[in-house]
Design a protein with these regions (language model features):
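Structural motif
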Residues: 22-31, 78-84, 130-134, 143
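Ligand-recognition surfaces built from glycine- and aromatic
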Residues: 295-321
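Blade-edge beta-strand/turn elements of extracellular beta-propeller
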Residues: 31-52, 83-102, 153, 157-160
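Secretory/extracellular carbohydrate-interaction modules
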Residues: 179-244
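Short, solvent-exposed beta-strand-to-loop segments that form ligand-recognition rims
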Residues: 284-300
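Short, aromatic/His-centered strand-loop micro-motif at the edge of beta-sheets
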Residues: 245-268
Length: 321
């Protein structure tokens, strides 16, 4: 699939392609055609040919301000949506430090503009047999990110306002601190979340803190849950089952995102859980995941070997009618 764009007196068509040859060769590329009448097309060669992937899927192209953005879904074991940026359609196409919009579970999206907002619609993939242990398979549930431009020209994503405002019963928790210098400690902030809710909090951690994060669908008695865990020393966050036992309790390869984690900096966390889909946003960095087993209905925050300050903590359950 490709896209058509009007450029001055002609149209530009981009398509995902690869070179003829063995499928093991990573010759994926985006190619271009031009036309003046939408009937007769001239092949113009490569639009972007990085030789990084086996194939380019779902190529997309749009402009915000001075920057052009070219999106493809990488046909690889990671199956991520990635982008490059340029101030010219002739390139060069620059790779930002974080070139993705989401993780392994978000795939084959396209963008459109609605009321001045750039909306990215992609698939949150299902897992084979609806089982946490199994691999992701094609298709699933459509899910929208709003794409926005940062000051440096790179792209972030956030929850579309209409989605965030669709929830009903909000409960706010008093600000608190988890001070746990020698072990891991959690604080439960909601006990009966149900299977559709949103969560928001601002968090700050101190120097030396090893990990912190959010747990949901938690059974407090069994200490079993799903969690988004922020590994401070690794500058990334990961979705996983807790405990990951019997090994592995969840196939989570690719369910992680890079995020620079700085002591004393305030991070805004927003999360939506809708049945088996969990989506988290942290300062413009998003991650989708699937959670099928649902051990319980508690929601908690945790930290290990350090201190975590939590403010603006809110849980909202159900949808407005």
């Amino acid at each position: 699939l490709g896209d058509v764009y009007k450029r001055q007196d002609q149209y530009l068509l981009i398509l995902g392609a690869r070179l003829q040859g063995p499928k093991t060769r990573q010759t994926g590329r985006t190619v271009k055609f031009t036309s003046k009448d939408l009937k007769n097309w001239k092949f113009e060669g490569d639009f972007w040919a990085p030789d990084l992937y086996t194939m380019h899927e779902m190529p997309d192209l749009f402009k915000i301000g001075d920057w052009w953005y070219h999106i493809v879904t990488e046909y690889s074991d990671r199956s991520k949506m990635v982008y490059r940026m340029s101030k010219s359609l002739e390139g060069p196409w620059i790779a930002p430090k974080d070139d993705a919009f989401d993780g392994r579970a978000y795939y084959a999206g396209r963008t459109f503009e609605l009321n001045g907002q750039r909306i990215l619609f992609g698939w949150v993939a299902t897992k084979d047999q609806d089982d946490d242990d199994n691999n992701f398979i094609w298709a699933g549930t459509f899910m929208a990110h709003e794409v926005y431009q940062r000051e440096d020209g790179t792209l972030g994503v956030r929850i579309p306002e209409t989605v965030w405002n669709a929830f009903d019963k909000e409960e706010k928790t008093e600000d608190f601190v988890i001070d746990t210098p020698t072990k891991s400690t959690e604080k439960v902030v909601a006990k009966d979340t149900g299977d559709i809710f949103k969560f928001e909090a601002d968090v700050e951690f101190t120097e030396g803190t090893r990990t912190f994060g959010v747990r949901f669908y938690e059974d407090e008695d069994k200490a079993e849950s799903y969690q988004f865990i922020f590994n401070v020393t690794e500058d990334r966050y990961v979705f996983e089952k807790k405990p990951n036992w019997p090994w592995p309790a969840n196939q989570n390869i690719g369910l992680e995102r890079p995020l620079e984690l700085v002591p004393g900096k305030k991070y805004n966390i927003k999360m939506i859980v809708d049945d088996t889909i969990a989506t988290i946003y942290v300062d413009g960095v998003a991650l989708n995941a699937r959670a099928y087993k649902r051990p319980g209905e508690s929601l908690s925050l945790f930290a290990s070997e350090g201190s975590l300050k939590v403010t603006n903590c809110k849980v909202t359950t159900g949808l407005k009618k």
